[in-house]
């Protein structure tokens, strides 16, 4: 998510920057009016029924995603699988925006484990064509977007996804919000209001990258008993591929082995949850993907100690989700995020998909 302090810069880039829709502050009705104005003046145009292939190139790597409307289903159906816990605050904001706009403004990101024949051959066929859009995104990412209107390909995609569960990669709060909004709006099973905009990535895609999120504790007790190491780099090397966490306090790095299967789960269950008690994680935890930033926060007194984590294994995350287990908030960070503004999905209950 774009930090609040950076929003003015994005708004200044263009009168049509998507943050005017997705991040309107409390002016939800203003966002709705802006969307309708963009439609009226032709800046936004409705496609015929379509799916989309999205390709991103970054750091010498490439990832392909399918963008489509995904049916909203409760977690109990075991088709859409969560892997992180959510909190109330973010959902209230997103629900207010959905109620005002009645539009799915940015895709939720899902991961799937395809059958051998799978979806990838379909995407390969589409990628041989000329893309509809080519653009450059943040951090030097290169994007291409293809429009898929062929009903034969639509049917092939539907068949490939039949009985295939999907894991929420990014957007737990937004998914639960979309489901709540769908139940409010209602409509028959094939109504547009029963779906959300989804970006779907094969778990075996070599360009699917997951990064760790480190924790800084604002207050609490020291955690000791680990193996002393010389530096942050040695700490990160020491936890790689192990059920272990790195710690930093009083200018001292350690590698601390954990009992269990997934380091972030064990860290919270064995250490952090005991410190939090009944308080929410936001009260005592700061999060960063930059280990050096975590060290600096501790040195500057922003926090009393840091915990470093290795990136979780995706198949392990999927396995836990299939077992109905969730990880602590901010256990995974999928990278690079899909840019907002490529495709929108109207949630009109009178539209049929």
Regions of interest found by a model, annotated:
Residues 1-353:
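Surface-exposed, charge/polar-rich loops and edge strands
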């Amino acid at each position: 998510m774009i930090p609040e302090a950076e929003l003015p810069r994005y708004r200044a880039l263009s009168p049509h920057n998507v943050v005017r829709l997705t991040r309107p502050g409390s002016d939800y009705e203003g966002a709705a009016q802006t969307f309708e104005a963009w439609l009226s003046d032709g800046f936004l145009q409705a496609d015929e029924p379509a799916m989309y292939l999205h390709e991103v190139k970054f750091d010498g790597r490439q990832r392909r995603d399918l963008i489509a409307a995904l049916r909203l289903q409760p977690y109990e159906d075991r088709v859409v699988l969560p892997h992180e816990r959510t909190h109330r605050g973010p959902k209230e904001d997103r629900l207010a925006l959905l109620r005002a706009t009645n539009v799915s403004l940015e895709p939720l990101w899902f991961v799937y484990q395809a059958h051998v024949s799978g979806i990838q051959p379909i995407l390969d066929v589409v990628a041989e064509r000329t893309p509809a859009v080519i653009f450059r995104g943040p951090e030097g990412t290169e994007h291409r977007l293809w429009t898929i209107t062929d009903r034969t390909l639509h049917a092939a995609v539907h068949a490939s996804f039949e009985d295939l569960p999907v894991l929420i990669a990014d957007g737990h709060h937004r998914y639960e919000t979309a489901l709540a909004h769908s139940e409010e709006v209602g409509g028959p099973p094939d109504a547009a209001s029963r779906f959300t905009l989804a970006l779907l990535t094969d778990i075996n895609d070599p360009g699917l990258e997951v990064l760790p999120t480190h924790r800084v504790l604002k207050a609490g007790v020291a955690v000791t008993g680990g193996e002393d190491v010389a530096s942050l780099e040695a700490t990160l090397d020491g936890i790689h591929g192990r059920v272990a966490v790195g710690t930093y306090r009083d200018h001292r790095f350690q590698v601390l082995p954990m009992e269990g299967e997934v380091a972030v789960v064990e860290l919270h269950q064995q250490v952090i949850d005991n410190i939090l008690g009944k308080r929410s994680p936001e009260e005592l935890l700061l999060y960063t993907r930059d280990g050096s930033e975590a060290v600096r926060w501790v040195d500057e007194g922003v926090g009393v100690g840091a915990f470093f984590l290795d990136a979780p294994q995706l198949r392990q995350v999927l396995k836990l989700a299939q077992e109905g287990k969730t990880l602590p908030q901010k256990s995974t960070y999928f990278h690079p995020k899909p840019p907002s503004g490529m495709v929108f999905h109207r949630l009109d209950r009178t539209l049929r998909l």
